[in-house]
């Protein structure tokens, strides 16, 4: 009885709490509410208070729901049967929505004016039902023209003086149009027409309706867009902006592999018909030689294998680049047409030597049979080209070239026929030859006309969606305030990544995004109040409810990695150095860089003086700081000392009593802290410093910031890994190292690097800030610590999210101190992983170094009986490739995309993002490479415990 009362009290309260709290996102097992709380552990505790019961229930539900969710995920990912079923479902879905879902455009109404809304409501829905319209909704055009000719003339003449043709209401015309056709159709069928008359009647209906549909649709589309949208597209429907073209193809034609799959299925069916009709009904009666049979079978097998390869090609190779699939598809299509023509040529050539000239009747029949053979091959090629244009609808330029190529080969068939059969044709009576040849020309030109019509249909279809794409992107650019000469697409799209849909977001960012959607929906309602008013109001309510739920989150600035399953694994491996972790650790909110008591007037005057003078020095070093420059060749001596002196001296010398000898001593001292380990060496620090300076030039910030800020950035980059032992934070925490105990397991190594730096600066022999004002030094110290701590990968997505929430409100020509150092943190983080942007050989070299360092840590973990980290046992190329693909896609590209948002001249995309994408492709090619990296043999007798002595802890 007691249990029942407790249940009745708790269950309604728990339902309310669950609706208000969204902290647990996994599926819940609702069956648990049917159980009374009679668990032994609960009863023994003798605590029947409401809160303890609620906690027990919540814990129980979380455990069971997590197990259920993990089991479902395991089945979906690892079960081959489920994979097969999912694949079949996906293709069935594509088949049902081939014409509308394949070219889905998000938020079309958001970017269209009233004219464009007409297109969305009519043309796009018509596109979905085009097949039904052609078969079921024709309006009896042909009959209407005959029966109601006088009536139409009278009505038009009576209104000619009062109305312009363009001002006539379309709905009235359409209603009259359908009425006339329905009346005539009833009269027509009363007279019991013959089958031939009925066939011609249906054919003319379809042809006229098809013609009206295409040309009316083209006229509406051309009248709906202004000239500015069309100017961005050339005559062959290619964007003048190269980035637009690539983004458009990868975004709106992602279903191309399936359409190729469907086209190949149709063609396999047509191949069977082609072979049966051609050989068993024609060639077998003409030729008795076995060579013809073998040749026909060989051609049939070639066609089957050809089309079957494009069914298996997208399924098994799993290529993610559409341009590779389309290129191979169209190149092979040319080969297919050439092989078909070659087959026809061989058959004709054989016929010229196998037919006797003394039998006129036999020769006459043979010429007609050759003509029929030629016509079948022409139809076969035309059907192949027609289906390719009409079904795939990929690129008008590609299909236009291929269609012209097919038409040229059709005329080659004519030449082939007249050249090889000329001596037979001249002996034929004109009366016997003329009519068959006329039929031959009619059917061949009919199919050529179908190719041209399919090409025109594709042109209209693709032009509409390209213009909508331009319209959408132009309006997105207008909404970005205080941004001049910025290409918004470069900031948001890459070949492998779309930031708006992929990167994990923080709750505060979700709130801002919901508010943006609310404002956009309000704008839609203001522009067109009568269009989907109820739906738009429901959207606003839903977004407000989402904001209300998000505001109940404990820390709205923390990125909820656990909500993104594909990011959770990568985050745990690369950012937390762990394979399994359910929830990210809570982080304290970052505080302001500058103290409120700081004398900003004196600071700004000091900074501006440095900025004006330092610009003179910086102009001499623009060429040296190329992003892809080889620093080992540029600085042939001690690279770290050379690049450090080159970066710091022109900025530090602006201070009156700056001591360059003390700067050299400081650099030598910091360099001595770097250990002889594979990756985190002084060369890595020099590379990061070079990257940070180069990034300032690419972002055009070198003349907008003070010299003291740049001075601190370069010190941060040179010292960000000083004293690194070649072990990560996870190892130091698990081994309870003194460093982890000192810094309370919080950014252990990063705090250690800061500590070494400022302990060095405390020594008068190395204090390069000795003559700086004290409040300037305090500010510099805070900024340097902030920058070095940002290199902890645990907070990687938090830094990206913080910038994303504020980037649209930043005036990049007049940056505040906080904004400068927010960008500097991103620059230092990007420079720290900058080896991902190098060309393949250099990138591979640095990757092997970091993997070697991880491997050594794994050996040390085994010797100390510590749980082995995930990245510390990679000894083959395929495992390394898998880890690097995730690292480059999910960690590197999002960060460089944010920097590309600031860049005005596309340099970040060219020098950073494109090389990363190229490196991803190279790693993709090594996914099946089982090459041994040789680390086990190299470190078989390594003294691993000596690595612990590398930590210079005092």
UniProtKB/Swiss-Prot annotation:
One of its GO terms (biological process) is cGMP catabolic process. GO terms for molecular function: 3',5'-cyclic-AMP phosphodiesterase activity; 3',5'-cyclic-GMP phosphodiesterase activity; metal ion binding. Pathway: Purine metabolism; 3',5'-cyclic GMP degradation; GMP from 3',5'-cyclic GMP: step 1/1. Binds 1 Zn(2+) ion per subunit. Binds 2 divalent metal cations per subunit: site 1 preferentially binds zinc, while site 2 has a preference for magnesium. Tightly binds zinc. The chain crosses the membrane at residues 260-280, 297-317, 328-348, 366-386, 402-422, 433-453. 3',5'-cyclic GMP binds at residues 680-684, 721, 832, 884. Specifically hydrolyzes the second messenger cGMP, which is a key regulator of many important physiological processes. This is cGMP-specific 3',5'-cyclic phosphodiesterase alpha. The gene is PDEalpha.
């Amino acid at each position: 009885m007691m249990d029942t009362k407790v249940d009745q009290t708790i269950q309604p309260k728990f339902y309310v709490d669950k609706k208000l709290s969204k902290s647990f996102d996994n599926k819940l097992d609702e069956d648990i509410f049917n159980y009374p709380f009679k668990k032994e552990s609960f009863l023994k505790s003798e605590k029947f208070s409401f809160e303890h019961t609620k906690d027990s229930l919540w814990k129980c539900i979380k455990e069971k729901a997590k197990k259920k969710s993990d089991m479902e995920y395991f089945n979906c990912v690892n079960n081959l049967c489920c994979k097969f079923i999912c694949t079949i479902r996906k293709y069935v879905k594509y088949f049902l929505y081939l014409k509308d879902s394949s070219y889905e455009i998000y938020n079309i109404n958001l970017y269209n004016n009233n004219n464009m809304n007409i297109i969305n409501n009519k043309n796009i829905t018509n596109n979905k039902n085009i097949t039904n319209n052609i078969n079921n909704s024709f309006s009896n055009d042909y009959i209407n023209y005959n029966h109601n000719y006088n009536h139409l003339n009278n009505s038009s003449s009576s209104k000619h003086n009062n109305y312009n043709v363009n001002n006539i209401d379309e709905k009235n015309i359409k209603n009259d149009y359908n009425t006339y056709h329905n009346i005539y159709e009833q009269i027509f069928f009363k007279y019991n027409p013959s089958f031939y008359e009925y066939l011609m009647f249906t054919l003319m209906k379809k042809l006229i309706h098809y013609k009206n549909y295409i040309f009316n649709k083209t006229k509406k589309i051309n009248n709906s867009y202004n000239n500015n949208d069309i100017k961005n597209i050339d005559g062959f429907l290619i964007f003048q902006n190269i980035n637009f073209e690539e983004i458009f193809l990868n975004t709106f034609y992602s279903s191309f592999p399936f359409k190729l799959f469907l086209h190949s299925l149709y063609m396999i069916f047509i191949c069977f018909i082609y072979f049966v009709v051609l050989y068993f009904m024609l060639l077998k009666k003409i030729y008795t030689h076995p060579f013809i049979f073998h040749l026909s079978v060989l051609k049939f097998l070639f066609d089957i294998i050809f089309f079957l390869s494009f069914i298996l090609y997208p399924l098994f190779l799993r290529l993610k680049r559409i341009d590779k699939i389309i290129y191979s598809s169209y190149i092979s299509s040319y080969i297919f047409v050439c092989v078909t023509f070659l087959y026809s040529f061989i058959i004709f050539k054989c016929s010229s030597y196998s037919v006797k000239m003394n039998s006129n009747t036999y020769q006459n029949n043979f010429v007609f049979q050759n003509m029929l053979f030629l016509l079948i091959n022409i139809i076969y090629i035309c059907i192949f080209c027609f289906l390719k244009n009409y079904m795939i609808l990929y690129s008008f330029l590609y299909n236009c070239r291929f269609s012209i190529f097919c038409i040229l080969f059709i005329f080659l068939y004519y030449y082939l026929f007249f050249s090889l059969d000329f001596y037979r044709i001249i002996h034929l009576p004109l009366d016997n030859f003329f009519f068959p040849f006329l039929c031959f020309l009619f059917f061949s030109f009919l199919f050529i006309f179908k190719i041209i019509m399919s090409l025109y249909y594709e042109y209209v279809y693709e032009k509409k969606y390209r213009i909508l794409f331009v319209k959408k992107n132009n309006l997105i650019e207008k909404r970005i305030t205080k941004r001049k000469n910025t290409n918004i697409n470069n900031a948001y799209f890459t070949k492998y990544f779309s930031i708006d849909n992929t990167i994990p977001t923080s709750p505060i960012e979700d709130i801002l995004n919901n508010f943006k959607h609310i404002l956009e929906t309000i704008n839609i309602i203001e522009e067109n109040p009568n269009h989907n008013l109820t739906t738009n109001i429901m959207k606003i309510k839903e977004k407000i409810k989402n904001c209300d739920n998000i505001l109940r989150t404990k820390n709205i600035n923390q990125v909820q990695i656990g909500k993104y399953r594909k990011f959770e694994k990568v985050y745990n491996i690369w950012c937390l150095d762990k394979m399994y972790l359910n929830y990210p650790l809570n982080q304290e909110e970052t505080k302001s860089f500058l103290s409120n008591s700081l004398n900003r007037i004196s600071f700004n005057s000091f900074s501006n003086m440095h900025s004006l003078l330092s610009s003179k020095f910086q102009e001499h070093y623009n060429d040296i700081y190329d992003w892809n420059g080889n620093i080992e060749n540029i600085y042939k001596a001690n690279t770290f000392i050379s690049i450090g002196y080159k970066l710091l001296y022109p900025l530090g010398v602006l201070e009156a009593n700056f001591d360059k000898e003390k700067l050299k001593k400081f650099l030598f001292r910091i360099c001595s802290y770097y250990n002889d380990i594979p990756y985190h060496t002084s060369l890595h620090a020099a590379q990061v410093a070079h990257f940070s300076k180069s990034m300032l030039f690419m972002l055009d910030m070198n003349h907008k910031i003070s010299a003291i800020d740049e001075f601190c950035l370069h010190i941060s980059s040179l010292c960000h890994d000083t004293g690194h032992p070649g072990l990560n934070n996870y190892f130091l925490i698990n081994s309870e190292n003194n460093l982890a105990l000192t810094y309370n397991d919080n950014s252990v190594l990063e705090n250690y690097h800061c500590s070494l730096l400022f302990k060095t600066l405390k020594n008068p022999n190395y204090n390069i800030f000795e003559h700086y004002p004290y409040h300037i030094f305090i500010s510099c110290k805070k900024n340097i610590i902030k920058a070095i701590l940002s290199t902890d990968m645990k907070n990687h997505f938090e830094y990206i999210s913080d910038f994303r929430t504020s980037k649209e409100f930043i005036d990049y020509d007049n940056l505040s101190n906080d904004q400068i150092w927010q960008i500097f943190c991103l620059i230092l983080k990007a420079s720290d992983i900058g080896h991902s942007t190098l060309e393949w050989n250099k990138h591979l070299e640095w990757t092997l170094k970091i993997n070697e360092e991880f491997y050594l840590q794994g050996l040390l973990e085994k010797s100390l009986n510590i749980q082995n980290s995930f990245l510390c046992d990679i000894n083959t190329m395929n495992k390394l490739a898998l880890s690097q693909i995730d690292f480059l896609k999910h960690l590197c590209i999002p960060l460089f995309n944010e920097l590309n948002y600031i860049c005005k001249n596309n340099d970040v995309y060219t020098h950073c993002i494109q090389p990363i994408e190229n490196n991803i492709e190279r790693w993709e090619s090594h996914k099946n490479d089982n090459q041994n990296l040789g680390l086990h043999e190299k470190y078989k007798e390594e003294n691993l415990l000596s690595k612990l002595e590398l930590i210079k802890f005092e």
